[in-house]
Amino acid sequence: MKVVFVIFFFFLFQFCISVDTIMRRQSLRDGEVILSAGKRFAFGFFSLGDSELRYVGIWYAQISQQTIVWVANRDHPINDTSGMVKFSNRGNLSVYASDNETELIWSTNVSDSMLEPTLVATLSDLGNLVLFDPVTGRSFWESFDHPTDTFLPFMRLGFTRKDGLDRSLTSWKSHGDPGSGDLILRMERRGFPQLILYKGVTPWWRMGSWTGHRWSGVPEMPIGYIFNNSFVNNEDEVSFTYGVTDASVITRTMVNETGTMHRFTWIARDKRWNDFWSVPKEQCDNYAHCGPNGYCDSPSSKTFECTCLPGFEPKFPRHWFLRDSSGGCTKKKRASICSEKDGFVKLKRMKIPDTSDASVDMNITLKECKQRCLKNCSCVAYASAYHESKRGAIGCLKWHGGMLDARTYLNSGQDFYIRVDKEELARWNRNGLSGKRRVLLILISLIAAVMLLTVILFCVVRERRKSNRHRSSSANFAPVPFDFDESFRFEQDKARNRELPLFDLNTIVAATNNFSSQNKLGAGGFGPVYKGVLQNRMEIAVKRLSRNSGQGMEEFKNEVKLISKLQHRNLVRILGCCVELEEKMLVYEYLPNKSLDYFIFHEEQRAELDWPKRMEIVRGIARGILYLHQDSRLRIIHRDLKASNILLDSEMIPKISDFGMARIFGGNQMEGCTSRVVGTFGYMAPEYAMEGQFSIKSDVYSFGVLMLEIITGKKNSAFHEESSNLVGHIWDLWENGEATEIIDNLMDQETYDEREVMKCIQIGLLCVQENASDRVDMSSVVIMLGHNATNLPNPKHPAFTSARRRGGENGACLKGQTGISVNDVTFSDIQGR
């Protein structure tokens, strides 16, 4: 019965035709291709450039730019288009120069005794060509075990200990010749495993040893989120692989014929490959750049990047003086060889030396490692084997001879301990103490200077206040009630913060034509905004606090200090401020296209915004918020994101403005609590509006509302349908599969892809979910907007579409009643903006 079953499947697979599979009796001729099941990869014949030579390989099927990831006959091209791919009589997948099968070009070369008569060749969606038996499911050969120059996700680099399989990358000869080049990236078999890029037989660049999360020579290698790195070192194999958690992300790593290694990601919007990271990129990356027992210190070097390790001196001082480091360093002549008083100097942020000759013990601690090194006179240095593992620093690496290819990094690397005698140890300790004394002396001097400057400023401000009482203003305006004690404290703050440029009141009056009504651009929550022109013809916008402004000195100082410290393409740029004669004013760059609400909430102007422009505005706002939340020196929560606070320059680039209510978070602080709720009805997250609780997810909520308003051209709080607001209406349509009905009908349908708009609506709904923990963060939003992501999570019920109970566990944040206006205005405790 078993024999009949095998024969049945044998004949079935001979005559079954599949787009991703070559059957035993089928052939693939030049001009024909097979596609993987998801049509991500193609396998067939190809040529490069204007060449007539034909190769058989694998490439991306959905990318317009030809990108080859694997070549079968890389060193044996076919001269014309008469080639053919088919199974040989003995069962190997083979490439022939012609259909008469007389000239064999390439073969999978599996032992005949292993092959089965039911073999097929299948191309997977990972880009892996697999020779396997569909009856037993056994795999006999796969292209992932024989890579060329490209390292794809879920491929493995390394070697197996039993059968000797070596998976390494070999560069092309040139851009137009995929033949085997000189550059080879392989896993070292000697010592502690590491990846080294060779040029011929000479080490060119060292990827380093595994740290527990990444390779020591690639500090920019990402950890987690989209990319997952994995390293295996056991009795069967030593290998490295990486995967992607988002199937829409297309990425590859390759060895270039020029001697560099690159990680590329595909940017579908721009139809191009983005260079995610590349190495080597500086002198310190070159293998053994500073010779034996030297290390490269490029980040802190002003003249020569090479330094001898502690206890060593240049082997050839004259060459070293002439910036020739090839001779490296040797042990200092007077240094004792082995003594009970030996110690270790710790070097921080190091790429540890080549581990080919290092000994390793993964079962001892770093403290035990130090003791063992001291007891062994041949031990010259030690370090943790995995310093970034989930269990912390584990394992012990020891060096017993010359140390090659060490360097420092600015914000990465690990601790490296060099053995020195007692004299050298005392010298390093003295240098460390003298450095601390210098820092202490500098701090004392700075404090004294600040105190002296404060006293001087106190005298200057007091004299200015006296003179101001007797001086009348040339401007005809109504002054705002103002606390002079606050003004004085602001003057003190100016002395401590040199990033606050100051404008003279007369300069502002002249620039705005005495605050002429013709120069008035509009009025915000804290007062009118005027256009001005300085004497150098520079156009400015002046925000002048009105008499009824709820913004006090703290909010005023907050906005000035925050914006002066922030620099980003999508944040409004402050030019300075003016605090004089009871006036408080902010001076900004002038943006001619006003604010976003002028465009999206007015039919005539909204018609000018096609889909590409709206998407660029959305992406710009997202990048600006991400900068505030994650990439700036300060973690900042804006708390008042809305359409009127998004300004547009002459090129319609969005700029986030109005930081009066922003809050600074500490590096590890995730959320805050306030008894004074400020913001704009319709844009505030529920936990903030009702409980006084705010976090970066509060801004995410506001962004989601703003994004949905941009897509629909409708205002959230002014939307009157059966649902309570625009968000609720969109949710109802989304639930019923009718969300396309809400797309702004003023947009030309030819300018947008309906699937992309639906994706953006889904992202907006992911931002406005009721529970803050369910909302995506801004880094995820930026990635979703930048990639053709298709597997987005399903949004949960948004906020403010049904009754929500106020208070709860964190309701104590609000100690007083919060006034809320149904109009689209910002509000505070008891008064509207």
From Swiss-Prot:
Keywords: ATP-binding, Cell membrane, Disulfide bond, EGF-like domain, Glycoprotein, Kinase, Lectin, Membrane, Nucleotide-binding, Phosphoprotein, Receptor, Serine/threonine-protein kinase, Signal, Transferase, Transmembrane, Transmembrane helix
Tagged with keyword Nucleus: no
Region (CaM-binding): 604-621
EC number(s) given by UniProt: 2.7.11.1
Domain (Protein kinase): residue spans on this chain: 515-800
Chief subcellular location: membrane
Disulfide-bonded cysteines: 284-296, 290-306, 308-329, 369-396, 373-379
Domain EGF-like, first and last residues per copy: 280-330
Membrane topology (Extracellular): 19-440
Ligand binding (ATP): 521-529, 543
Annotated ranges, domain PAN: 338-421
Signal peptide range: 1-18
Membrane topology term: Single-pass type I membrane protein
Positions bearing Phosphothreonine: 674
Annotated catalysed reactions: L-seryl-[protein] + ATP = O-phospho-L-seryl-[protein] + ADP + H(+); L-threonyl-[protein] + ATP = O-phospho-L-threonyl-[protein] + ADP + H(+)
UniProt cross-references to SMART domains, sorted A to Z: B_lectin (SM00108), PAN_AP (SM00473), S_TKc (SM00220)
Record protein name field: G-type lectin S-receptor-like serine/threonine-protein kinase RKS1
Lineage of the species this protein comes from: Eukaryota, Viridiplantae, Streptophyta, Embryophyta, Tracheophyta
